[in-house]
Each structure stands twice: as structure tokens, then as C-alpha cells.
Amino acid sequence: MRTNYCGLISEQYLDQTVTVKGWVHRRRDHGGVIFIDLRDREGIVQVVIDPDTPEAFAAADSSRNEYVLSITGRVRNRPEGTTNDKMISGKIEILAKEIEVLNAAATPPFQIDDENISENVRLTNRVIDLRRPVMQRNLRLRYQVAMGVRRYLDAQGFIDIETPMLTRSTPEGARDYLVPSRVHPGEFFALPQSPQLFKQLLMVAGFDRYYQITKCFRDEDLRADRQPEFTQIDLETSFLNEDEIMDITEGMAKQVFKDALNVDLGDFPRMPYSEAMFYYGSDKPDMRINLKFTELTDLMKTEEFKVFRGAADMKGGRVVALRVPNGAEFSRKEIDEYTKFVGIYGAKGLAYIKVNDVSNLSNGEDSGLQSPIVKYLSENALKEIIARTGAQNGDIIFFGADKAKVVNEAIGALRIKVGLEHGKDNGYFTDEWKPLWVVDFPMFEYDEEADRYVAVHHPFTAPKEGHEDLMVSDPANCLARAYDMVLNGWEIGGGSIRIHRADVQEKVFAALKISPEEQQEKFGFLLDNLKFGAPPHGGLAFGLDRLVTLMTGAESIRDVIAFPKTQRAQCLLTNAPNSVDDKQLRELSLRLRQKATETKEV
């Protein structure tokens, strides 16, 4: 019987006999004495086996990395000069008396302590990958966060209620994952993109405070922070306004960080969406980086430089500057790389000015400003740019000029990239936790491709008081009672006050060009139940995967999920998705128009 975990044996167990079980992390033979580092989920302990115990010595001699052993022995101090203060077990070792080989192991595809393994190799051999201490720590922290959330919400009076995994398809936003019904040929269930409508109906039913930690599914193009199936901390409340909901969920975030990381997040400032976009070009600004946009659109309307003038005069156009302290030292190669980088976001180029001498702001050859564009700008404009940005000698000013969407995305991404690469050495990056709330989102945004307005969050978000009429008369300026929790440039949670009146919900659907017939077909069950005395209600959903990724410092959410999918939505461990035989398809009344092709990653 095991008496202790390997990584938890300390000096308090000196001279005691213990039994540990685990995997051979490393085996060393030193002059006839064998050393084994035995590993389990709590860490590693050093075991010494000498020839005086021949059976144990023989078992140790035949063991290799990843063999599973049971070891009984006496705890003793390590010799002077061989201790490791970074480990709980770093000052002791076990002198083995008995060793039992519980299972042999084939040679693993990589060493457990190898840090230079490709992600595809790791995901193909995920079980072995999960033995690595970093993965064990990540998933343990994930568990601690989930348990902390449950404890906090339970103390706040929330009830854990499960909602269906098989529901109806409502194709708004991302694509649904569909499940064919055998019992109802030709009809399909959808896996939920969120429990949104069910949790609202639970409020109508009178449960007052609901939560669950649940799987959600979206068939969308994947990025580093996306998965086709992801875990959501979902909650909903009745009779609370947005300030009260934000206070509860902010308290939850603070408690979780304190318990799991011993970090005090402090109070969360609140920033209107318009301010976030104006100064940072993003609705999830990374406040660790002390760089802001400077607005130049008005200034460029009277300039002759076509690149800037054209953007300033364009409907929905924008011209901004981004001052980077000490950036004049950037090489031509670095600037070219930044130019290529902003091109990813649709920018056609990256204009810049290096500030060498603010006392000489002419546009002539002797100018204290170094740039190919200086000669195209008036001296008045150059002086105004320096004044507005506050640029000093040694700075560089980058410019964005295009449609506002392109400028915001391109220069916003450049702000992050420059800040992370150069900010710490130059005083404009603070390496600490910087949370905030972004509030007062627009209710709608115009989708040029679809030629209609679409909901910024979702169509069940309530408009701000006094903005109801704007949904029809001026949808572009209609604000929503929505709020996002942002941490270090990541949106970790988003929510809103919901629409609790059927007539208002119908108005929102109408503004989104959803006909009354389509409303009834897709959302009739919601509209019908809102008429039975629905209380005012609202809520929020956290992305558990994203939250834990931030807390662990992992490079991808795939590093905090036990069995994730790749960026092509495949499981390399099980080779899912896979083709199925014709018999299964016939049972589901399905026939393939196109046979499956081999697209597995290698």
C-alpha cells in the first residue's frame, strides 16, 4: 500500500519507512550504486539502491525510463552538497529495501523532460505528453480554478443546473456542429454554442441564480485561443443590474487568482468601448503596454499627402499615429518586418517618422525628422503631429491610414507587438496583471458582406435605457447593456443584461432583418416564454480554457486541455474525426455526396 506521494516526502519523514509508487523519471548508475528519480503527480523523489539489497538492486538494474515501480525504503538525509532547495523532497532520499516492477514500458517517443518537442508529436502521443510536469501543473491549476469558481458561486447562492447538449440549430454567428437524428430521419440536433437561451429560460422559471461549467461547441476556423469544443463558466442572475453582476463576477476573479496564484488583482477600472477603440484600436486593450493612438484624421483633411488625405476623407476612414519612445533606434530591417506584420491585417504599408531633433520641424532636407514622408507634409502638420503625440528626440512615430477597421486592427496589433518586444527595456511595458471592464458596447455593427446590421454580442442583449428607439432610427449609435472582462489583452469573460420583454426582443430581431416568421420558427420557444412574466435578468460567461492559459503562461489553450484538437480540428491521438461505415449512415438516413479524404496532420 502506498504511504506517500513522491513529491511530498520531506524532512518530517526522516528515519521512517515509506512506500511510494510511480514512474522512473531518470535512472543513474554511479559506481555500483543505482539512483532512481521516481515521479508521480506530486513530483519527484530520489531513491538510492545499493548492492546490499540484491533483489531490489536487480529490479532497479533492469528498470528503464517510464517503468512503473513500487518502492519501499527508509527516508534519510541527502549527503551534504547534493540537496535541491527547489523541491519539497530535495533534502532527503529513500534508501530502498524492496522494489517491485508493476509494469515495464516501451521506449517513449520522447524524453519526459525534453522541452523541444513539436506540437504534433506531443498531440499524437498525448498520454506521454501529459506525464510531463508542466502539463501536470497546468491541469492541476485548471482543477483548482474550477473548484474555486464552484465554491465562490455556491457561497453567492448560485445553483448548478445542467442544460441540454442536444438542442435545435439556430444558425446565427458561428456554424453549428450537427447531430443527425435516427428516430427523426432528415432532422438534426445541434451541439450548443452556449447555454444562452436555456439559462434565460431558467430565469423565467424562477431559479434566480444559475451556473454551470459546461462544454460548448463552435465549428469555426481555429486560432491559438480557439477550440471546436471549449469549456465555459456560465452564469445568469435575476433582478440584478449590470453593476451588481460585474461586482459579483469581479469578486469571483479576484478570489480565484488569490487562491490559485496568491495574486491580488485589485479593483477593475471601467472603460467605454469607444475609448478603447479610440486609444488602443481594440475592445480588449492590453493595459500593460503604455502606448496610445493619437488621432490625426481631422489634421489630414487639409494636407496634400494623398495616402493620409484619402483616408481622412474616406467614409469610415481614420488616420492615427503611434508614438514609440526610443524607437528611432529601430533598424530598417525591423521596420520592414513591422510593415510586413501590419499587412496581415490589411494595411497597405507602414509610414513612420524618426524624431532626431524636435527643435527643427521643417520638411526640408535639413529636417530633424527622418522619413520618406516628411517632404509631403506641411510644416504646420509636422509641428502638430509632434505636439499631439508628445514625441521627443529618439522616438519613432508609426502611422495608420485606411478604413477605421483596418487601422484599428493593424496599428492595434503593432502596438502589442512593439510593446511586448521593446516595452520592458524602454519603460512602456509593466509586467503585472492589468484587468479592466470594457462597457457601453454598440448594440449592432454593419456587415458589408451581408448588407445588414448584425448583433455585436448576440441578439438577446438589451439596449441601454433610452436607446430602444435607436434600434430602428439609428442602429449605428444604439448602445447595449453589455460588458466584457479583459485581462492583459485577453477577453476572459463577456456578458450583458438580457431582453426580458417579448415586444423588445421582437424589435431587435426586426432590426437584424429577421422576419416574424423566422423569429417564430427559430426562437418561438423563447418569445412565448418571455410573455409569462420573465424577470429582468443578465449574466456572464467566462472562457475557462483562456483563463487558465493566462494564469499558467501557456503558449496555447491546447496546453491547458487534456485532449485538445489541432488547428485543423483533429484529434491526433484518436484520429478523430473518422469515416463511418455505410450501415451507420443508412441507419441515420444519410448518404455522402463526397467520400472522406485523408487530411490528417503529420
From Swiss-Prot:
Record flagged with keyword Endoplasmic reticulum: no
Enzyme Commission code: 6.1.1.23
GO MF annotations in UniProt: aspartate-tRNA ligase activity; aspartate-tRNA(Asn) ligase activity; ATP binding; nucleic acid binding
Catalytic activity: tRNA(Asx) + L-aspartate + ATP = L-aspartyl-tRNA(Asx) + AMP + diphosphate
Listed transmembrane segments: none
Keyword match Zinc: no
Region (Aspartate), start-end ranges: 196-199
UniProt: ATP binding residues: 218-220, 227, 491, 543-546
SUPFAM superfamilies the record matches: Class II aaRS and biotin synthetases (SSF55681), GAD domain-like (SSF55261), Nucleic acid-binding proteins (SSF50249)
Chief place of localization: cytoplasm
Site (Important for tRNA non-discrimination): 30, 81
InterPro entries reported for this sequence: Aa-tRNA-synt_II (IPR004364), aa-tRNA-synth_II (IPR006195), aa-tRNA-synth_II/BPL/LPL (IPR045864), Asp-tRNA-ligase_1 (IPR004524), Asp-tRNA-ligase_1_N (IPR047089), Asp/Asn-tRNA-synth_IIb (IPR002312), AspRS_core (IPR047090), GAD-like_sf (IPR004115)
Binding site for L-aspartate: 172, 218, 457, 498
GO biological process, one term: aspartyl-tRNA aminoacylation
EC class name: ligase
Family (UniProt): Belongs to the class-II aminoacyl-tRNA synthetase family. Type 1 subfamily.
Subunit-structure text: Homodimer.
Protein name: Aspartate--tRNA(Asp/Asn) ligase
Gene name of this polypeptide: aspS
